[in-house]
């Protein structure tokens, strides 16, 4: 990730006196000059590749847990899906809203405003991440039982989520900054951050599960550690003063207009993810009643396979215009 970062250099269009002062910075502003069709390909394909890689990891994660811990652990892992998806929903709430606001500010040439959005994203993710962690750590067992856990699977789901919740703030920051990274003109760098997380995860998973004998907790720790490493790369990027968007004094105070804008724009993807959580909860409860723990585990595996094929089809679809241009 860090090596690929150094290779991700993009030029930007010249503007007024402000850009003269920013001439040494390498944050791209080609969004204002490049063809929309080309930008669509440049931004959509890296995003879908990253999501496809994440789907592949989720399948590998299930394989490691299934062979290293057992089938009931797969069922316990499946029970955590609504909680994981809910955490992702909060990540989308901030990430989608912030990335849109950053794009708008850059389009308006309000670069100071874009930096304030970056600072608000960091603080807002920490606040929401801590609140999410506190609430669900206090109510974890009742929530898991409501999701369809049984006496046979509750320990696996609890062990996994306890570790994930410890690193939940990291997850929120990672998702939020990756969205801003993409919208500020670095779609490939955002993809590299995700791919780095996936690769590290796949390396640590078998080491922690089979090598150290940590069981399902090992898989959770692999997830948290991989996100910490990717987040470190993002923080290094935004800490570089030569970048157009970078951390500096005066951008971390929450502004009501920025927070409202982020939440308003991000509410739609948040509600979509929330609905997906509710659907999975209802299905898991029905499967527990009529099929038992193994049925919940089987449904969790099917979910991962289906999502992988959705990502592959999306990648084929978005690359179609490019292939037509080549013809």
Where are the language model's segments positioned?
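Generic alpha-helical transmembrane segments of integral inner-membrane proteins
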Residues: 48, 52, 56, 60, ...
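Signature of the first transmembrane helix
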Residues: 38-99, 103, 267-287
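Small-residue-rich hydrophobic transmembrane alpha-helices
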Residues: 74-134, 171-190, 299-324
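Hydrophobic residues within alpha-helical transmembrane segments
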Residues: 45, 49, 83, 123, ...
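Short alpha-helical transmembrane segments in multi-pass integral membrane proteins
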Residues: 2-44, 102-169, 211-266, 320-324
């Amino acid at each position: 990730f860090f090596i690929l970062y150094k290779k991700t250099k993009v030029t930007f269009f010249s503007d007024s006196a402000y850009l003269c002062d920013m001439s040494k910075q390498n944050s791209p502003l080609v969004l204002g000059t490049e063809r929309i069709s080309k930008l669509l390909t440049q931004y959509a394909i890296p995003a879908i590749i990253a999501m496809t890689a994440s789907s592949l990891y989720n399948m590998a994660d299930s394989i490691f847990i299934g062979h290293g811990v057992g089938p009931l652990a797969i069922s316990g892992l499946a029970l955590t899906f609504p909680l994981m998806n809910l955490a992702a929903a909060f990540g989308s709430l901030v990430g989608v809203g912030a990335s849109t606001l950053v794009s708008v500010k850059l389009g308006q040439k309000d670069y100071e405003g874009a930096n304030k959005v970056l600072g608000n994203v960091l603080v807002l993710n920490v606040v929401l991440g801590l609140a999410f962690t506190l609430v669900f750590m206090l109510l974890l067992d009742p929530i898991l039982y409501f999701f369809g856990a049984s006496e046979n699977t509750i320990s696996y789901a609890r062990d996994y989520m306890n570790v994930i919740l410890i690193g939940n703030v990291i997850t929120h920051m990672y998702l939020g900054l990756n969205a801003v990274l993409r919208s500020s003109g670095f779609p490939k760098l955002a993809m590299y951050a995700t791919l780095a997380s996936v690769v590290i995860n796949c390396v640590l998973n078998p080491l922690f599960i089979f090598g150290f004998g940590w069981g399902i907790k090992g898989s959770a720790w692999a997830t948290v550690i991989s996100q910490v490493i990717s987040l470190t790369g993002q923080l290094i990027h935004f800490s570089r003063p030569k970048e157009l968007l970078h951390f500096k004094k005066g951008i971390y105070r929450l502004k009501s207009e920025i927070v409202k804008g982020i939440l308003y724009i991000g509410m739609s993807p948040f509600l979509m993810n929330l609905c997906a959580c509710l659907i999975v909860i209802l299905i898991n409860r029905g499967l527990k009643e009529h099929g038992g723990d193994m049925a919940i585990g089987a449904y969790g595996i099917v979910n991962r396979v289906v999502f992988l094929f959705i990502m592959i089809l999306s990648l084929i679809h978005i690359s179609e215009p490019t292939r037509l241009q080549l013809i």
